[in-house]
């Protein structure tokens, strides 16, 4: 080094060495020599070049920096003259970034800002030295970072001997925070770095997914936005990456504060140190004291009051730790504005009342998860050529970790350098039990739980994804009451061991597997701990029989969860097997392969005289319970949930039994059930499911006591004829669907919100129907005896959905005010006159053979979005439709001839997606077809204009589609060909920012008129290619037809399918790739017809077409507009008649016709525009035409267009028209 630093040492330097980076012979002989002497007197090893003239090779010096623990970077006036000094500084920055080095800057007669901003002669020398060097940018970054670390300033007034002592103290303080080799327990030194104890290999992988996390956290800490002192909590489940995030934050922010400190591993430190040591450690760091064990905390507080402070507290686990630091935190809050405190914890409750805001660290997304896993799995060879062979397995491990960073690191590390066979073996082992290294992380949090919380955690694992109310009800018991159960759920939620989402209790997959591992360990110990049996091999294969026969083990079983789908062999239970299970709370025999639990072959044989003295049982689920009744010794005193679907039961139990806790009963499809007398005392019952209980004829009168019953399902109870008179005040949902002998419906609750009477034999609704003021849904589908709807329905002001489908005898709808109704289904009825429906959104009139026309007033239904007219075989015409209609289905309207002109109103701000279907409308007149195509064109134009204006067309989606009988591509399509494939050469700059979407057309023919389908879909694969690139194909929908409700139909005629879609994928790749280049582009389109999910060979695309749709520049007429296939202008919404290739006068303005692209020629003489002939395509390309000698006017018009004289062209055209 040119008069630079560092000594020659051949042996490996000892631990805790100091490297001095400096420039200048004068500095060496005086200040640096005194500093080296002082360091050595304090037993601190230091490296300095004693051989000024020859120095050391630079690579040796850089290696010494890597081996060092601390660097003293001494910035002096001549520092930037030396390339070696600056290259050393670059290396110092890299090492500090990696967390392997603590840097202490020393400003020798220079201001830190001079160094940081490269000012004055210091900066001039740097620019002169670095001129032309490609490393200049990295060097500037080093100068920007290192001086931002709090250092020591030596100015002209300083006493150098005192400053030397100050530097020695700072070095000693920093050394106390550096752990022994291999350890990661670093408490930051006074002038050090939070990552001092992080190995050099750790940095790279920790950045995966952390950039966005850091950005989000910094927004909550924003110093410009929040002027006062701010305390932020960083929370998340164990191993989620809180520590990594805090280290990144600390490293980025520490230079912005005059005092800063990170105290990590507070959970661990608190176990080995007295709590009063925590404030001593923190204050020592903040006060830059040589001895962090401060006895008098009052002395340095004034310093905190006067400075902006950054404090980072990591892994706080108990309130006492916060309380121990409270006094310092209060001083910081009351001190100078702008201080920041960050507290990381896995227990959110610790931050309550303490923090100003909370940042929750989320799981990594799939991309970052895969990167992190691959980094560790291939850490020694990131370019491993075989990595692609492991990709599928990698996906499996990433899926297993579910975005958990620590799990990804652990799994990747365990698989590093392992064969594919080992990877496969590891995956199979993980299916049985989690990695011990992952278990150990969660074990720390689990061990800190109380006994009640541990039981609650393990119980919840058995019922994850269930309703929160349900889980809390199961947990509530004599030893854990309702309040305690709620408290346990909240505590576990605060500790991120569970979470609640949409009212359900969820648990991360890793924690779920951990909970099972905890129970498995309990079974391998002395059996004294309560446990849950939930794996098939634990229960059947030498498990349950052994447990049930062992009195001590049986007494400690808390739950049995047996998936019957995994039982392969017949298994018999003895009548006495359950008598010793006095603590059993959860007994569940279920089938995971069938959610309806109806297809299980029960291979568990139960004796007739089974004993079941389960007094403590809360949850009893037994699929296909084989006995006629529960045993006499069964005691439901604590029973909360009873589920016995597809059972052989005739009644629950003999006689009356107390059921004070029973809230849920599900006996669905118990076809022999004939009595519900056992539920006479279930006064807290909330849900009762008796669907498919075909023998049940009546309800006991005692059911009127069920004042909390909110849900009653009697669907398919075909023997049920009536309900007793009662008032179930809490009942909200009543289902009587398919009760075919149920003739009279009594009003059993005024509070019903959803009432299903479909498929019943009722002929009329109750006289007091108006009492149902909360009724939202009334379903009377297929009530064939129903002849009229009472006028009292008009008084049901909350009613939103009325279903009268297939009420064959219903001919008249009452003249009532139903302005509140949103959904009205009248399909399959004989109603001829429509009611007033100002608010209806979904109207179904399909399969009505009586309706011949619709009321003209339907165009005023501004809320109407769906109109279903399928198979209205007498319908001959349709009026103008309202502007917000999104779906019109007129399939099979065989008498339909005409449509309104215009077909529907279009709003200037049109953004609605819409689909208009006229398939199998075989008598549709040509004028009607032309209006449909004209409407499609106007819809495309205005959709593009509105969406470009409102959201820039950033979302790729189908915006409009229609289909109708026909055999021609509409004339407004600019490119067309015969067949299913179209190739076009697009003009330069076709993909500029005005491109809003693409209009597509396909004429589809059925090769077999007798073929029947339930669905027909037309899609287009769009590919663009220029001179340099070929992009991935983009598939978009053109149109489709679906036979809803099952069944199939013929599509005999040829049909035209038109679709308009936004195309950001195509646009984006071109805009980003070559938006400024003037290159012609080829486009290739292939249209495909599918039936269901696969291509249908019985249908063929006869013709196809394409138009690109552009947004018109409203501020100016661009010369580029000459290339546009279709311009979007205000004039189009003003056109009252269809576009047929001529200019028409509309509201005092002239409208330019939609012209073809220049590859389609306009024939004319002397500037006159005639109806254009289509240029037919030969293999997707236009055939060449002989140029006429009378094309001068045509050419002149094109020149004027290119020069922007669009108005001249329009007037010239009109004049000659």
UniProtKB/Swiss-Prot annotation:
Residues 14-175 form the TIR domain. It comes from the Eukaryota. GO terms for molecular function: ADP binding; NAD+ nucleosidase activity, cyclic ADP-ribose generating. The TIR domain mediates NAD(+) hydrolase (NADase) activity. Self-association of TIR domains is required for NADase activity. The gene is RPS4. PANTHER family: DISEASE RESISTANCE PROTEIN RPS4-RELATED, LEUCINE-RICH REPEAT-CONTAINING PROTEIN. GO terms for cellular component: nucleus. SMART domains: TIR. Interacts with EDS1. Only two amino-acid changes (D195N and H950Y) are linked to a change from a susceptible strain (cv. RLD) to a resistant one (cv. Columbia or cv. Landsberg erecta). LRR repeats lie at residues 260-285, 436-459, 614-636, 637-659, 682-706, 708-728, 729-749, 750-774, 796-818, 819-842, 861-887. A motif (Nuclear localization signal) lies at residues 1170-1177. Gene3D superfamilies: Helical domain of apoptotic protease-activating factors, P-loop containing nucleotide triphosphate hydrolases, Ribonuclease Inhibitor, Toll/interleukin-1 receptor homology (TIR) domain. It is an enzyme of class 3 (hydrolase). Residues 1162-1195 are annotated as: Disordered. GO terms for biological process: defense response; signal transduction. It holds the Pfam family NB-ARC. The keyword Secreted does not apply. Keywords: Hydrolase, Leucine-rich repeat, NAD, Nucleus, Repeat. This is Inactive disease resistance protein RPS4. Residues 211-472 form the NB-ARC domain. The active site is at residue 88. It catalyses: NAD(+) + H2O = ADP-D-ribose + nicotinamide + H(+). It comes from Arabidopsis thaliana (Mouse-ear cress). It is found in: Nucleus.
